[in-house]
Amino acid sequence: MRPGLKASFAQLHRSAGSVFGVVLFIILFGGTWSLGGDSLRLWWQHLPAGEPLPLSVLTEQGMAQLSGENGVHIVLPSDRYPVISVCRHPGDCPVLLSAVTGQPVSAAAPTDIPVTLHKNLFLGFPGRMLVSLTGVVLTVLLITGLVIHHRKIRLLLRLRWRQGIRRFAFDLHNLTGLWCYPWLVLFALTGALSGLGAFGTMMLADRVSPQAPQQIMQQLMGSFREPDAAGEPVFSSVTELLVQLPARYPGFIPQIVSLQNPGRDDRVVTVSGVREGQPGSAYFEQLRWQGTPLRLTGIRDSAEQGIWTRAFIAVQPLHYGQYTWLAGAAPWLSALHFLAGFAACLLTLSGLSLRALNAPDSLSSRLTIGLCGGPVLACTVLLLSAWFSPLSAPAVFPAVWLITVFFTLLYPSLSRALLLICLFCAAGFVFAALVHLFSCAGAQWYTDAALLLTAAGCLLCAVVLWRKNRCRSELCMN
């Protein structure tokens, strides 16, 4: 590549990172947190571990909660979220029950604050569009970064953490970018398509069918095809249906049971889920039974859709790390997805640190560290407040974030301010994880493991910063 063209790519990479880097880190951190959003909600409520109750028992309990309704939607429990949700319609779920104890569970927790931050920056649908645009920015950074460093693949294993903070940040930036490149591309493209695709669908619906825009979504979902009635069994109850469903449809994983007109002869039962080997969500894979007794009358299968529709369907599960459709590999891929998200945060933060360390006393450098360190520190305080804080968690998050910004602006040494932030976060994550791990007998242990990993990352940064502040030689300052 010509030197002039490579220099232009390098300048574009630095400019895009400088302008959008802080927002990108905030969204990536919130996204990584969101991967464990459901587990963190249970973590906050200190729910015990144990074997889940039979699915038929949980379903009967759920239907009994809203027995007077014309329609009931029951979201079935999963390994990641052992809770059964009873809804009047999707999004309106007044009853949540633990799949282990059958006891009520709170529908929300303060740990949902960073999740909302990632989804829409607390700005509703316009915020969702802004978040999607950062996916475009990340794509630009990934392309320009690959062009700049494409001849340095041999350096992907190098991490000089004992030779100064700048070299450590530089190597960390290269290492995370090269090792996690496929996942970063996945995050960028699916993140951009997630919001922009929804916006495009909404605009199309207003133009094509302004009187009934929901019809566009119905067309995307596809129509039910009639099954071959020969050999299909009939069921006297929903419980019997769910018990025999795995044997009858071994590749179908149920996630939602919808009942219309329960208790009547014209009742309709729709079981939504995913199929093994097909990336999708519950609204695109459905089986429908009608009447008394229940007879299979419709099958909706995304495999019958066109290639572009199937790509649209796959965006959400790929972006949120929902790998249920890959059966046995799902836990490992979900863990890898989280690690890639964690690496994406390190990638962005190390790139911003390189810029901030070039002018540590400038206002922009201090704001960068404060705005990026703020949400991490605020989440640490959120986790600690689950045990002994009398403060309102929704007020704690923005307050701690703002205090962190002022702290980095006013503290004499920026590197020492960052060192203190890293130490507090590391100690807070370790304390919260260990206390929960031992007090709840291992429930949500994978959440505690993720918190300990985050603490290790903060501690490593603290060690490097401590060496920088301790060392006065020219070698350590470079």
Where are these regions (language model features)?
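Conserved histidines in hydrophobic membrane contexts and catalytic metal-binding motifs
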Residues: M1-N478
